[in-house]
Every structure is written in C-alpha cells, then in structure tokens.
Amino acid sequence: RTLHGASLGDSADAFIEWLVALVRERGVDAVLISGDVFDRAVPPVDALARMRRALRELTEITTVILTSGNHDGAARLGLFADMLTPSLHVVTDPEAIGTPVEAGGALVYPMPYLEPDLVRQSLSDLPARGEADLPTPLPRSHQAVLGAALRRVRADLEARRDAGDERPAIAMPHAFVTGAQASDSERDIQVGGVPSVSADLFDTLGDEEPLAHGLDYVAAGHLHRPQNISGASVPIRYAGSPIAYSFSEAGATKSITLVTTDATSVTDIEVVPIPTLRGIAVLEGTMDELLADPDEATTASYVSITVT
C-alpha cells in the first residue's frame, strides 16, 4: 500500500515485528484477521512475500484465522492455505460459513466478504419458486446475504448449545455495520443503494429472536478506523487497520484488540495501541504561521498541509 505515492512497506514490516513479539509475550491463542489483507485483488510480489513471512512467523507460535475482504482476491488469498500447517485457517469460500474453527477454547466463525450479486443464490434459504429446483435468490442487499450467512452460524450454534456446548462464540464478518464511522481509504461496497447492515442482526443471527446463548463477540472487518459499534447486545468492534492509509485517519490511534474468554463467555476486551513508525498529521495556516510555529511532534510524520 502507498500513501500518495510513498511506500508504507517499512511501516508494515514494523507492525509485523511488533505483533509477533506481542503474541509471543502475551501467549495469544489465536490471531483473527477479518479480511482486507491486501489492497487489491492482484497484490504486488513484495506484499505477497511480506504476508507469507508474517503468516510463517505467527503460525509457529499461535493459530491464525484469516478471511477474504472486499479488497482481496478470494482465490488468490486462498493460495496461502497451501502452507502446510494445522495452525493456519484461510477461509474464502462462503460455503464454509457455519463451520467454526475451535481455537483457544472458543468457537470462531470465519465469514469472508459476501458480494450480494455473487452469493444471493448460493446462500439462499428461501423456498423454491414455481417449478424451479433452486431456492429463490435472496434480495440484492448486504443485509439479506449476511442474514442468511448468520442463520448458518445460528443453526450450528443451536445444535451445539442443545448438546451442552457453552463455549464462547466469535463471528468474523466483513461488512459495514450501521453506525460505524468510515474513512476515505475504504472502498464503497454499496449495493442496491444500501451499504450497511444493522447491528442487531448479530443478536438475532438472521432470525426473529436471539438465542439464549448466541454470539459473545463480533470481530468485524472492513473499516480502517478502530471503533466499537452500538445497537446490539453482543460487543461489536472493528480493530481497524494497523497503519493509517489516508489523512482522514489523522488523530485515530491504531490498535489491536485482545479478547479474553473463559469457559462460557468473553471476560475482557483490551485495546492495545500499535507503536507508530510514522504518524499522520494535518496542518493548516498561513505560510508565516507554519514557519513561525513548527510542530516538533510531526517531524517524522506524513503531513498534509493547507496553506491559507
């Protein structure tokens, strides 16, 4: 990724080094990456090499669960699944939704980005129309396809709860949840005029009423700004991107989210700031003001300056 032509490769390398050290120090059981590993469907060779190195270092010490986002080419990202290690789970196929990865005493439900036009037939649980053998396609919206995906999660969870399995459940959707704050470095995923999904969808899991014990945490992907989402009983959080990709993210502290669980629930959600190799700053003023009052804190930062 670049910022106005400047490579952010050194910032990515610094983050990976820090993350591996943190995972080792804190004894993290699993690293969840909810999509947008790359910025484009066909990433450059150096980005592929960097990702392979990061996955190799992380899977030596923990489990990694990785899904495809709207920026990623799902088929190309799936190539990482050939890294022969049981500690790496790469989920790019919507048909895999509803099958959890059991990690760290929790049930983790990976959910790759769902493009409505591509999955409204395959994920449909609507009755067949007329004499057709296929189910009726879902409505052309993110709300409809994510709802259908969550019903698959619900079906698996219901069966497990009925069998006495009360382990905490974590979902990994890649979507724009209503109430979230975007930045100008995300790509528009609007379909049918509606880009977002309602937060309470994660309470009901696509049905009318919540389960007695449904999801315990939602590790959402897509937005670059770290933030909690209100509107649901289950905690929903975007960890955000580890590096700022636009000047609209100035002032937002980058972080990762550490989620602690016990045998049945989430017990703690800790936000850990990421050390910044180079910050993002936005300055405004006359040329005289800017020269007369230099901001020492921005010496090593990428700076956007508006001269008035």
Where are these regions (language model features)?
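N-terminal active-site segment of His-dependent metallophosphoesterases
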Residues: 1-54, 59-60
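Hydrophobic anchor at the start of a short beta-strand
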Residues: 64, 169, 269
